[in-house]
Regions:
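Alpha/beta-hydrolase active-site loop
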Residues: 164-185
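Non-catalytic accessory segments of hydrolases
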Residues: 1-171
Length: 185
């Protein structure tokens, strides 16, 4: 996605239910960006990601859901997320934590962005980054990207059984993200 990182043996690596991910240190916080929590075919319900071998990098933010073009003046200042790479396979999340100890039992805060289910992303504004909140609140912070607008809420049920849940795909993504948090943090 255009970001390049130099990895070292000291970068934090954690085990998820699907496999290991490599994050990075951000001041006093450990950060893991763009972790896939689910996968789905277009207009279908999300499924858990398939397990992998080796270590996947969680060093850069993942894709945001494709967004409608907005032509209001100065929109790039108000909503810089429209310049982030967009793709319908946007079921990813970001985690910031002070501790890698699985027994630490820190409170977890999950950020589901606004936007009326048609706009927004987990990374649309610098204020959504969880490193400061994690550091000063001593909590684990998770921000979630999920399907929006027609990719997440278009009712295609009249076109057959295959699409019976299409109007709830975006909500199902959020539930899948919460399940991932429950299973992995």
């Amino acid at each position: 996605m255009g970001d390049y990182f130099v990895c070292s043996k000291t970068d934090p690596v954690v085990e998820t239910k699907a496999g290991k991910v490599r994050g990075f240190r951000l001041n006093t916080t450990y950060a893991f960006h763009g972790i896939h929590y689910a996968e789905a075919d277009r207009f279908q319900m999300p499924q858990p990601v398939k397990p992998w071998k080796g270590i996947k990098n969680a060093l850069a933010y993942g894709y945001v859901c494709p967004l409608l073009k907005q032509d209001e003046p100065n929109m790039e200042v108000l909503v810089p997320h429209r310049y982030w790479p967009q793709d319908e396979h946007c079921q990813n999340l970001n985690v910031w934590t002070q501790s890698l100890d699985p027994g630490a039992k820190k409170p977890v805060m999950v950020w589901l962005h606004g936007g009326g289910f048609s706009a927004g992303s987990a990374i649309e504004h610098v204020a959504y980054e969880g490193d400061h909140l994690s550091e000063f609140g001593d909590v684990v912070v998770v921000s979630v990207n999920h399907r929006l607008n027609i990719l997440g809420y278009l009712d295609l049920s009249p076109f057959g059984e295959k699409y019976k849940n299409s109007a709830n795909a975006g909500n199902a993504d959020m539930v899948a993200a919460l399940q991932w948090v429950h299973d992995n943090l």
